[in-house]
């Protein structure tokens, strides 16, 4: 009986302590998000560095998939939507194909995808960074070019992932300053 009373007290104290923090946990994570962003981008870059050589060696095309127009969309009024669509594009179209390119890189691509999912989740929790609904023409151009490249598209998209990270950084830096 004594241990169940102790357990009830612990549950009650945990609940009381968690209750005030529940409303502010999201706010706190949003407050600290700008400070955590460099670490999140570093994690993305570190994860990408494990597969970068593999995909860049297989990318035999000279043209860029991620063009300057995409960066301009990231910096413009469509920045939120462009970022959201590009994250979705990489998670749903590029990463699943990239994982199947070689068994030796599958875990590394998976890790890269998990880091990107974590970033997306944090962006969605902090509506100030991802409050959007419009479509980006630049993202549509990226998707069309990717599809036209067929099997070579995966190498192109993955070999340029570092450019995507730089665009994310440019967008987030702009949002943090505003």
UniProtKB/Swiss-Prot annotation:
Keywords: Cytokine, Disulfide bond, Glycoprotein, Secreted, Signal
SMART domains: IL10
Positions bearing carbohydrate: 134
Subcellular location: Secreted
Pfam name, any one: IL10
Major subcellular location class: secreted
Any GO molecular function: interleukin-10 receptor binding
CC per GO annotation: extracellular region; extracellular space
PROSITE patterns listed in its UniProt record: INTERLEUKIN_10
Domain of life: Eukaryota
Signal sequence, renumbered to the chain: 1-18
Tissues expressing the protein: Produced by a variety of cell lines, including T-cells, macrophages, mast cells and other cell types.
One of the GO BP terms on file: negative regulation of cytokine production involved in immune response
Disulfide bridge map: 30-126, 80-132
Subunit structure as annotated in this protein's UniProt entry: Homodimer. Interacts with IL10RA and IL10RB.
Assigned protein family: Belongs to the IL-10 family.
Protein's job: Major immune regulatory cytokine that acts on many cells of the immune system where it has profound anti-inflammatory functions, limiting excessive tissue disruption caused by inflammation. Mechanistically, IL10 binds to its heterotetrameric receptor comprising IL10RA and IL10RB leading to JAK1 and STAT2-mediated phosphorylation of STAT3. In turn, STAT3 translocates to the nucleus where it drives expression of anti-inflammatory mediators.
Protein name as catalogued: Interleukin-10
Source organism: Homo sapiens
């Amino acid at each position: 009986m004594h241990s169940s009373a102790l357990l009830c007290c612990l549950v009650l104290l945990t609940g009381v302590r968690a209750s005030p923090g529940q409303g502010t946990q999201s706010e706190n994570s949003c407050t600290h998000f700008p400070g955590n962003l460099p670490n999140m981008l570093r994690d993305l870059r570190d994860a990408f560095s494990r597969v970068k050589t593999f995909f860049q060696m297989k990318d035999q095309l000279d043209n860029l998939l991620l063009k300057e127009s995409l960066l301009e969309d990231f910096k413009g009024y469509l920045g939120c939507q462009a970022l959201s669509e590009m994250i979705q594009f990489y998670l749903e179209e590029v990463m699943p194909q990239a994982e199947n390119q070689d068994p030796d890189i599958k875990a590394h691509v998976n890790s890269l995808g998990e880091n990107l999912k974590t970033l997306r989740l944090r962006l969605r929790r902090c509506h100030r960074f991802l409050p959007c609904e419009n479509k980006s023409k630049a993202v549509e151009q990226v998707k069309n070019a990717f599809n036209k490249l067929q099997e070579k598209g995966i190498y192109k998209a993955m070999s340029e992932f570092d450019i995507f990270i730089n665009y994310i950084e440019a967008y987030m830096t702009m949002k943090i300053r505003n």
